[in-house]
Swiss-Prot record:
GO terms for molecular function: DNA binding; DNA-directed RNA polymerase activity; magnesium ion binding; zinc ion binding. It comes from Prochlorococcus marinus (strain MIT 9211). GO terms for biological process: DNA-templated transcription. Zn(2+) binds at C74, C76, C89, C92. The gene is rpoC1. Binds 1 Mg(2+) ion per subunit. This is DNA-directed RNA polymerase subunit gamma.
Length: 633
């Protein structure tokens, strides 16, 4: 697929994150220019020249490595304009191209000594420690130059492979080796720092270790077995991804493109820069100093100290604060490392890649809507008019209320009555999706029929709260409008709240009344001990139907907990056992039976003619509500 700039778009299925080999790290940043020159290595800590405000060559913003900072213009200004596309300036070595290449071209820093990757060393679990089958404390002692490690015991009987030695212990062994009467021919080899770690990891034969571990697992149990399985799992993953353990030790560090760590000039002439530039500068300074010390054959203790400082600088770049003191900038603020940019809610993945803004969506606080049906939600008019605007405009034009989109938008801004009427027509039967973050299971997004409400809060039925894990203490929910007919149908058929009664995890009902609803139901159906029961036929307390009771309650002629006689032909609980308390045969042959909480009139054959029950007004309200809800459902 090609667009107007003739750029090819690569379609991909997935993103896979694996360990990168040193060669691959170099290949990300290393490029061969059309004139045959190889560029990519960042060797200077400088960013820009403060007099010319142009990037320094071979620095962190170098135009030769990352591309020109102005479209179609080289560093020295010899070549300008698009007609010189692809030419490499013979004076400054900058390729004439678009400046946007500075968003994706990378560089690299070739390290004077290997350094360990802090994620694999200090992560939980520590993969380096698991692979080497050593305690993490011991591995740290090696990496941060506190202890030597035996890489080859040679002819020395007291040494073992991977044994740790302090400085004093190694000096004693050296004296022993180089003594005049020494019988040791094959000298032991020890190492320190990330170089020693790299050597230990290189010595691992993963396939052989995996076979040995499988044999050991069959004959072991308990905690030892769990530890072996843990190690085997890590080794199997390395084998499956064709990654080598020594790649966890870095020989080169990639430098991300300069436009992703920009430097901008402020009004006062000062510069604001990304924290990454400071962290990269520390690494380059220490790396260059180490290279110079190695060149002049400086004493081992000085070189070793510089290597440790380089290790700490790379640790801070990758994950500041994971180990040791946190590197701080001006006003004692911790610098944001690569890990800080990637991880967390504000990180690159959750904020920018997964959390993109979506058209036809809104967000507002939720409040309880007890008068709603379970499949309904209250949508503020202000939100609805914005979300359904294209549909409203289309209908306004189709009904010849307006002639064009501009006139329709003006009418909508005035919130005309006609607009509200059209909006009501549009949302009828058009489901919307409500989502509450975090969406931990499929019931985190459900469909509802919108009902227009005043105010600015979304109204939600209290019964659907457990599915969303929502409460009404300031929670917010997002609204999405399904546009296509297919998506609307799916929302109605599969996602409607009244169709999602059971939890997908347990199969038990997730729609269960709780808190206020339980309390309300209890209060509604409670019996007041001091309330007196009326006699049958009392005009103020005897009613012909449930509706009459509710009308009398709404007119405030009776109270919620008053006892009433009401005619009711439905099923009742047979809470009376034995004989009726009073029985009487009338002149027409019919019989009256008086029970504790009901009064029945039966014909000569004993069939029920009419029934009055003694109950409270609250119970009538509850019963009437349930019957209405079931009848609609």
């Amino acid at each position: 697929m090609t667009n107007s700039n003739l750029r090819t778009e690569n379609h991909f299925d997935y993103v896979k994150i694996t360990l990168a080999s040193p060669e691959r790290v170099m290949s990300w940043g290393q490029r061969t220019l059309p004139n045959g020159q190889v560029v990519g290595e960042v060797t200077k800590p400088e960013t820009i020249n403060y007099r010319t405000l142009k990037p320094e060559m071979d620095g962190l913003f170098c135009e030769k490595i990352f591309g020109p900072s102005k479209d179609w213009e080289c560093h020295c200004g010899k070549y300008k304009r698009v007609r010189h596309r692809g030419i490499v300036c013979e004076r400054c070595g900058v390729e004439v191209t678009e400046s946007r290449v500075r968003r994706h071209r990378m560089g690299f820093i070739k390290l004077a000594a290997p350094v360990s990757h802090v994620w694999y060393l200090k992560g939980i679990p520590s993969y380096v420690a698991i692979l080497l089958d050593m305690p993490l404390r011991d591995v740290e002692q090696i990496v941060y130059f506190n202890c030597y490690v035996v890489l080859d015991q040679g002819d020395h009987k007291d040494l073992k492979y991977k044994q740790l030695l302090t400085e004093d212990e190694w000096l004693e062994i050296e004296d022993e080796i180089y003594a005049e009467d020494s019988t040791i021919e094959n000298e032991p080899v020890v190492g320190i720092g990330a170089e020693a770690l790299q050597q230990l990891l290189e010595d691992l034969d993963l396939k052989e270790i995996a076979e040995t571990l499988r044999e050991e697992i069959t004959g072991s149990k308990g905690q030892k077995r769990a530890k072996l399985i843990k190690r085997l799992r890590v080794i199997d993953n390395f084998i499956a991804t064709n990654a080598r353990p020594e790649w966890m030790v870095l020989d080169a560090i990639p430098v991300i493109p300069p436009d992703l760590r920009p430097m901008v000039q402020l009004d006062g002439g000062r510069f604001a820069t990304s924290d990454l530039n400071d962290l990269y500068r520390r690494v380059i300074n220490r790396n260059n100093r180490l290279a110079r010390l190695q060149e002049i054959l400086a004493p081992e203790i000085i070189v070793r100290n510089e290597k440790r400082m380089l290790q700490e600088a790379v640790d801070a770049l990758v994950d500041n604060g994971r180990r040791g003191r946190t590197v701080v900038g001006a006003n004692n603020r911790a610098l944001k490392s690569l890990s800080d940019i990637i991880e967390g809610k504000q990180g690159r993945f959750r904020q920018n890649l997964l959390g993109k803004r979506v058209d036809y969506s809104g967000r507002s606080v939720i409040v309880v809507g007890p008068k709603l049906k379970m499949h309904q939600c209250g949508l503020p008019k202000e939100m609805a008019i914005e979300l359904f605007q294209p549909f409203v405009i289309h209908r306004l034009i189709r009904q010849n209320i307006v002639n064009n989109i501009k006139a329709a938008k003006k009418l909508i801004q005035r919130a005309d009555d006609e607009v509200m009427q059209v909006l009501q027509e549009v949302i009828d039967g058009h489901p919307i999706l409500l989502n509450r973050a975090p969406t931990l299971h499929r019931l985190g997004i459900q469909a509802f029929e919108p009902k227009l409400v005043d105010g600015r809060a979304i109204q939600l039925h209290p019964l659907v709260c457990p599915a969303f894990n929502a409460d009404f203490d300031g929670d917010q929910m997002a609204v999405h409008v399904p546009l296509a007919i297919e998506s609307q149908t799916e929302a109605r058929m599969l996602m409607l709240a009244s169709n999602n009664i059971l939890s997908p995890a347990t199969g038990e009902p997730i729609v269960t009344p709780s808190q206020d609803m339980v309390l309300g139901s209890y209060y509604l159906t409670a019996i007041q001990p001091e309330a007196s029961k009326p006699d049958f036929g009392d005009q103020s307390k005897t009613f012909a139907s449930l509706d009459d009771v509710i009308n009398a309650f709404e007119d405030k002629r009776i109270k919620l907990h008053d006892w009433v006689w009401v005619r009711f032909n439905g099923e009742v609980d047979d809470d009376d056992h034995g004989e009726p308390s009073h029985s009487e045969t009338l002149e027409d042959g019919t019989r009256i039976e008086q029970w504790n909480l009901r009064r029945d009139r039966l014909d000569e054959q004993g069939a029920l003619i009419s029934r009055f029950v003694l109950t409270t007004v609250g119970r009538v309200v509850m019963n009437h509500t349930i019957i209405d809800a079931v009848a609609i459902a």
